[in-house]
From Swiss-Prot:
<feature type="domain" description="NR LBD">
    <location>
        <begin position="27"/>
        <end position="261"/>
    </location>
</feature>
<keyword id="KW-0010">Activator</keyword>
<dbReference type="InterPro" id="IPR001723">
    <property type="entry name" value="Nuclear_hrmn_rcpt"/>
</dbReference>
<keyword id="KW-0675">Receptor</keyword>
<keyword id="KW-0238">DNA-binding</keyword>
<dbReference type="Pfam" id="PF00104">
    <property type="entry name" value="Hormone_recep"/>
</dbReference>
<comment type="function">
    <text>Nuclear hormone receptor. Binds estrogens with an affinity similar to that of ESR1/ER-alpha, and activates expression of reporter genes containing estrogen response elements (ERE) in an estrogen-dependent manner.</text>
</comment>
<dbReference type="GO" id="GO:0005496">
    <property type="term" value="F:steroid binding"/>
</dbReference>
<dbReference type="GO" id="GO:0006357">
    <property type="term" value="P:regulation of transcription by RNA polymerase II"/>
</dbReference>
<dbReference type="InterPro" id="IPR050200">
    <property type="entry name" value="Nuclear_hormone_rcpt_NR3"/>
</dbReference>
<comment type="subunit">
    <text>Binds DNA as a homodimer. Can form a heterodimer with ESR1. Interacts with NCOA1, NCOA3, NCOA5 and NCOA6 coactivators, leading to a strong increase of transcription of target genes. Interacts with UBE1C and AKAP13. Interacts with DNTTIP2. Interacts with CCDC62 in the presence of estradiol/E2; this interaction seems to enhance the transcription of target genes. Interacts with DNAAF4. Interacts with PRMT2. Interacts with CCAR2 (via N-terminus) in a ligand-independent manner. Interacts with RBM39, in the presence of estradiol (E2). Interacts with STUB1/CHIP.</text>
</comment>
<dbReference type="GO" id="GO:0005634">
    <property type="term" value="C:nucleus"/>
</dbReference>
<dbReference type="GO" id="GO:0030520">
    <property type="term" value="P:estrogen receptor signaling pathway"/>
</dbReference>
<keyword id="KW-0446">Lipid-binding</keyword>
<dbReference type="GO" id="GO:0051091">
    <property type="term" value="P:positive regulation of DNA-binding transcription factor activity"/>
</dbReference>
<keyword id="KW-0479">Metal-binding</keyword>
<dbReference type="GO" id="GO:0005654">
    <property type="term" value="C:nucleoplasm"/>
</dbReference>
């Protein structure tokens, strides 16, 4: 289980109800402000002075991802209602979406820089720099294409905040818990996802466009999430491949997340005996 997912449990039998009522009391505007306050800080990674090699680029990217994952867990816990889900559910959601959240954050940072990927303020990559890493150019192209579409839509910061939270809350395709673990967990999650969706609808409505344009914009934004998921799947496959080939060592929280992905794949695969978590 995620060692950073939080150890604090609910204090008092009425705490979950009280916090749920607090979520109900938040207006869409207040929820968006809460998401803004939850935003993680920029992470620095310091680009190597020498030209990138396959190993050095993958090392920079995995170090950055590991640092960002720690902040991602803190971010998720600041979303109103998230810590009221069972710890099991919190972990499963984060394990299911972490690559997507990293990628949509990358897209947002890169939105005003056509042709570039702003992994960090001090790690800006051109598309062609990916040529030194086998298989990563396809992923760079997917990231740049989806970022370009967000740019065409003139994605606003508050829209981005809502979309990123929705990626987290809508990330797990399988039932999260059994009735014996937490009977109302699915209800809590659906309630929270609805609240964030309402916040996104409110943000779009505040732009002043017509009702028809609002509906179209919402649809266009949500349709792009499948592209983020596709890029995430490709990124996960590539990272596993790089690790299996010993191109780059993977440690700490990133290794934990990667192993969780492998184990989930084993459980859902008929040929599960062929899978084994990375060591």
């Amino acid at each position: 289980q995620l060692h950073c997912a939080g150890k604090a449990k609910r204090s008092g039998s009425h705490a979950p109800l009280v916090r749920e009522l607090l979520l109900d009391a938040l207006s869409p505007e207040q929820l968006v402000l809460t998401l803004l306050e939850a935003e993680p800080p920029h992470v620095l990674i310091s680009r190597p002075s020498a030209p990138f090699t396959e190993a050095s680029m993958m090392m920079s990217l995995t170090k950055l991802a590991d640092k960002e994952l720690v902040h991602m867990i803190s971010w998720a816990k600041k979303i109103p209602g998230f810590v009221e889900l069972s710890l099991f559910d919190q972990v499963r959601l984060l394990e299911s979406c972490w690559m997507e959240v990293l990628m949509v954050g990358l897209m947002w940072r890169s939105i005003d820089h056509p042709g570039k990927l702003i992994f960090a303020p001090d790690l800006v990559l051109d598309r062609d720099e990916g040529k030194c890493v086998e298989g990563i150019l396809e992923i760079f192209d997917m990231l740049l294409a989806t970022t370009s579409r967000f740019r065409e839509l003139k994605l606003q910061h508050k829209e981005y905040l809502c979309v990123k939270a929705m990626i987290l809350l809508n990330s797990n395709m399988y039932p999260l818990v059994t009735a014996t673990q937490d009977a109302d967990s699915s209800r809590k999650l659906a309630h929270l996802l609805n609240a964030v969706t309402d916040a996104l609808v409110w943000v779009i409505a505040k732009s002043g466009i017509s009702s028809q344009q609002q509906s179209m914009r919402l649809a266009n934004l949500l349709m792009l999430l499948s592209h983020v998921r596709h890029a995430s799947n490709k990124g996960m496959e590539h990272l596993l491949s790089m690790k299996c080939k010993n191109v780059v060592p993977v440690y700490d929280l990133l290794l934990e997340m990667l192993n969780a992905h492998v184990l989930r794949g084993c459980k859902s695969s008929i040929t599960g005996s062929e899978c084994s978590p990375a060591e």
